[in-house]
Amino acid sequence: MIVSWSLKDAVVVVVGSGKNAYRRVNLCLSENSSKIFWFCRSSADGGFDVGHLQLDAKKSDAIEILPISEFDPVRSLTTLGKEETDFLVDAVFVSESNHHEKEILHRTCKRYRIPLNIIDNPSLCSFTLPATWSEPPLQISLSTSSNGCRLAQRLLRHVVSSLPSGMPEAIERFGRVRAITKTPEKKQWINHVSDFWPLEKLVRMTEDDLLAIVSDNFSLPLSSSQSSSLANSYESLSTTLDKPSLTLDPEAFPTHKRGSIALIGSGPGSPDLLTVAARKAIMKADYVLADKLVPEAVLQLIPRHTPLFIARKFPGNADKAQDELHQVAFDALSRGDYVVRLKQGDPYIYGRGGEEYLFFTQHGYVPTVIPGISSALMAPISAGIPVTHRGVADQFLVCTGTGQKGSMPKIPSFVPTQTTVFLMALHRLEILVQALIESGWPRVLPVCIAERVSCPDQRFIFSTLEDVVEEYNKYESLPPGLLITGYSCNTLRNTA
């Protein structure tokens, strides 16, 4: 278990010499410990072997350097502390793994409940130090639970190297905006940006960009494609306004002087599950308009020079966000841009794709529609659930867990041989489950919660209808997710 522990104003004992001892002393100094008793070995010149501390912190009044020969594993720990702690010290660090009195130290610290860390002796420690990287305000700690500190350091370097440049400064900007954002609703908007928007985009956002997110009337300031007017000219896919354009030729994604737009399904999350047509369209786009739930791995396929606008569809702001998105699209279309409207899953399965198709068509722009793999289809496959199976399920139904304007949708009748998938349901899971039970659905019906399907951190929680809420509440949510119900949930699990 990793916890954040403060050593501010603490009295700490450090035993040992060399760089490991120095690091622990420096750690205590950075934590503003009030007093550090450093029991140190002598150096070759007769002084103390304090390493780099000679150059900086040696003069600090917080440090008292003592010969290691004066250290007593009982007396030193029970007399050097503050009066308010009955003279017990607050923590002990031992930087020598073969210290001859480490067993006595362990028993003493255990008796007096003094936190103890002995390097390379996890069985004698009451706490261990994780591998830590810090560039304020960002701190990252990683632990292998005492199974390999060198491996932990290597893994930490890998994690840190994957961070976009400028992440600490971006966190500071987020902190300032959160501090001046007063309403809970707008703070939730900021949380959604933190949860769903690509990190590469977050580090490029200014404080004004963040303030625009919580503004009621201000569109996000985004750079437009300066070179779109010089883009190659393509033949129009369709000039007919009375029928959808559903051409899947990967080379046929045109722009003309009036601009053109494509509604594209980005699939459940993995870039590998994008259609070839969708990939080609993304690469050729002059402007991309994306839903907030489109995973970062998919958004990373967008060329860096292509402007990206992410819809501000936060709770309570969906309609305004849709209007804003339309305006951004029209601005790009009026420049002659080829606009890609990137939607999670499939545009026509609870993606408002039909509404957007009608809207743009009525305004003179007939969208190309490129389907995507819906999570309603992908989630059961990833979870090992055959939505139809001879003798178990011969029907498949896709429903929403959230009706228009947040209302409860009509609950379908229970059919024993039917697999039902509820999209947009997990944020109101308890209400939905109660409605299903009240409508006669069996309490013991097998169910599965699927989250972030096809992403590296995908998760599946199997349960029954009556227990799924309690089971789900044991975990932090990983949106987007959905609920799968039906006896097919256990078909393959029972044979495993």
From Swiss-Prot:
It is an enzyme of class 2 (transferase). InterPro entries: 4pyrrol_Mease (IPR000878), 4pyrrol_Methylase_sf (IPR035996), 4pyrrole_Mease_sub1 (IPR014777), 4pyrrole_Mease_sub2 (IPR014776), CobA/CysG_C (IPR006366), Met1_fungi (IPR012066), Siro_Cobalamin_biosynth (IPR050161), Uropor_MeTrfase_CS (IPR003043). The keyword Lipid biosynthesis does not apply. One of its GO terms (molecular function) is uroporphyrin-III C-methyltransferase activity. Keywords: Amino-acid biosynthesis, Methionine biosynthesis, Methyltransferase, Porphyrin biosynthesis, S-adenosyl-L-methionine, Transferase. Its EC number is 2.1.1.107. Transmembrane segments: none annotated. The keyword NAD does not apply. It catalyses: uroporphyrinogen III + 2 S-adenosyl-L-methionine = precorrin-2 + 2 S-adenosyl-L-homocysteine + H(+). One of its GO terms (biological process) is siroheme biosynthetic process. Siroheme synthase involved in methionine biosynthesis. Belongs to the precorrin methyltransferase family. This is Probable uroporphyrinogen-III C-methyltransferase.
